[in-house]
Amino acid sequence: MSNYAPADPRASSNRYRYNGTCMTNPSERFDNLVGSDQSFEQLRRATFGEQPEEGIVLTTLDNAVNWIRKNSIWPMTFGLACCAIEMMSMGASRFDIARFGAEVFRPSPRQSDLMIIAGRVSQKMAPVIRHLYLQMPEPKWVISMGACATSGGVFNNYALVQGVNQYIPVDIYVPGCPPRPEQLIYAITLLQEKIQAERGSFRRALNLEPVTP
């Protein structure tokens, strides 16, 4: 299921309390690692009581792998039109995407795990986008940024694709023309939540399970 970033991300501004790159509350950091599975919650309470001992974390390999992946997202250096300007602003000092571990923009799809479709997609560009997507290693994710990438926007004509999801799967949609950098940052946090909730990550990392194309 794809998530849809709201137009005003300020509604969730209190959801996380970051100090640099870490949550300020140790118990919140612990809960984020172990996930919400009730069996692990019961095991934690039976072992440590209400508050875990300092420096001890109870988790699974899946949750550990997901935690590492969600905090080390490498977007591709890739822009199509106007929305790419807002994407570049996201990487500058004012918005500082480095707080979320996603400041490493890579020029090669083989070294990236996030593609941000920032701008309208022409019929000639769509096969190129799909080719770049197929070159990205697993696991990989896609954010559709702006009205044009999502549905064609104001360009409703034969030359443009009416939604990039016709060519590649999309994980997060960001509305706006163009969206503000805060909205794209909120989309990154939604993607991090989706990554953390994935199951079977460790087995797929060891090629023990087939990956759905």
Curated annotation (Swiss-Prot):
One Pfam family, please name it: Oxidored_q6
Keywords associated with the record: 4Fe-4S, Cell inner membrane, Cell membrane, Iron, Iron-sulfur, Membrane, Metal-binding, NAD, Quinone, Translocase, Transport, Ubiquinone
- Per UniProt, where does [4Fe-4S] cluster bind? 82-83, 148, 177
Look up and give the membrane topology term. Peripheral membrane protein
Spans traversing the lipid bilayer: none
Which reaction is the catalytic activity of this chain?
a quinone + NADH + 5 H(+)(in) = a quinol + NAD(+) + 4 H(+)(out)
- GO MF: 4 iron, 4 sulfur cluster binding; iron ion binding; NADH dehydrogenase (ubiquinone) activity; NADH:ubiquinone reductase (non-electrogenic) activity; quinone binding
Which SUPFAM superfamilies did the record assign? HydA/Nqo6-like (SSF56770)
Location(s) in or outside the cell: Cell inner membrane
Q: Which cofactor does it need?
A: [4Fe-4S] cluster
On whether Metal-binding is a keyword of this UniProt record, the answer is yes
Q: A single GO BP annotation from the record? A: electron transport coupled proton transport
EC no.? 7.1.1.-
What is any one of the record's Gene Ontology cellular component terms? plasma membrane
Q: Which InterPro entries match?
A: NADH_UbQ_OxRdtase-like_20kDa, NADH_UQ_OxRdtase_20Kd_su
Cofactor binding notes: Binds 1 [4Fe-4S] cluster.
NCBIfam families per record: nuoB_fam, PRK06411.1
What family classification does the UniProt entry report for this protein?
Belongs to the complex I 20 kDa subunit family.
Relate the assembly described in the record: NDH-1 is composed of 14 different subunits. Subunits NuoB, C, D, E, F, and G constitute the peripheral sector of the complex.
- Function noted in UniProt: NDH-1 shuttles electrons from NADH, via FMN and iron-sulfur (Fe-S) centers, to quinones in the respiratory chain. The immediate electron acceptor for the enzyme in this species is believed to be ubiquinone. Couples the redox reaction to proton translocation (for every two electrons transferred, four hydrogen ions are translocated across the cytoplasmic membrane), and thus conserves the redox energy in a proton gradient.
Name of the featured protein: NADH-quinone oxidoreductase subunit B 1
Q: Which organism is it from?
A: Koribacter versatilis (strain Ellin345)
* Highest classification ranks of the organism: Bacteria, Pseudomonadati, Acidobacteriota, Terriglobia, Terriglobales
